[in-house]
Design a protein with these regions (language model features):
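Conserved CoA-thioester-binding segment of acyl-CoA-metabolizing enzymes
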Residues: 1-46
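Amphipathic alpha-helical segments at domain termini/boundaries
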Residues: 1-6, 10, 167-197
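Short glycine-enriched loops at secondary-structure junctions
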Residues: 48-54
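An acidic, glycine-rich surface segment that forms the CoA-thioester-binding/catalytic face
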Residues: 61-105
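Glycine-rich beta-to-alpha active-site loop
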Residues: 90-138
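Well-ordered beta-strand positions
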Residues: 121-122, 161, 182
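Hydrophobic, secondary-structure "cap" segments at the distal end of domains
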Residues: 147-157
Length: 197
């Protein structure tokens, strides 16, 4: 079977601390079922968004600014570690070694949102969606796995160039380069995932 997580961060479609905790809890629930397949084993974990036109815009920049202004290093570190915890578990399946992760990108995936999409075993994106790492444009870097996840798909040289450019790329470009595994027709992403499963 499959388990779908539909991201719906509020008030902005970014990686809020609440959303990250929910995603980790989602993985824990699936992991707890691995020894009891009496009803149906979860083989596929699908990460998607129900925000039209957006997968995820990445890190919660408002939270960053608020915590930096308040000098709250501990809370900022907690946020960063929580991001890493989710991406690590989603990409390695330590609690669910028999499962496969799928990211369905039906809208923009930027920064940490793109990292989340890249963390999956299979990245399915609708044509015309945009993905990239804009962090360099405001003197940051994507530090939650971007280089590792991207270099596995395109090599270290192209990964560095993509990260340092700050550019956004279409799903079609990324498919040509091997970043996106499967292209879907706009509006048919769910059907494409189900056909893959």
């Amino acid at each position: 079977g499959s388990a779908w997580s539909w991201m719906h961060a509020h008030p902005r479609p970014c990686c809020t601390l609440e959303q990250l905790k929910e995603l980790i809890a989602w993985g824990d629930v699936i992991g707890a079922q691995k020894d009891d397949c009496s009803s149906q084993c979860i083989v596929y974990e699908v990460l998607a968004s129900d925000v039209p036109g957006t997968f995820s815009l990445g890190g919660d920049l408002k939270l960053f600014v608020d915590l930096i202004r308040a000098g709250n290093r501990e809370a900022l570190l907690h946020y960063a570690v929580t991001c890493c915890d989710f991406l690590y578990e989603f990409s390695t399946h330590t609690k669910r070694p028999e499962s496969m992760s799928i990211s369905l990108v039906q809208g923009d995936a930027l920064g940490g949102g793109f990292e989340g999409a890249l963390a999956a075993d299979v990245l399915i994106a609708e044509r015309g969606t945009l993905m990239g790492f804009p962090e360099i444009k405001f003197d940051l870097f994507p530090g939650m796995g971007a280089l590792t996840f991207l270099s596995r798909r395109v090599g270290v040289d192209r990964a560095y160039r993509m990260i340092l450019s700050g550019n956004r790329y279409t799903a079609e470009q990324l498919h040509d380069w091997g970043v996106v595994d499967i292209l879907a027709i706009p509006g048919e992403g769910v059907e494409t995932v189900n056909a893959f499963i």
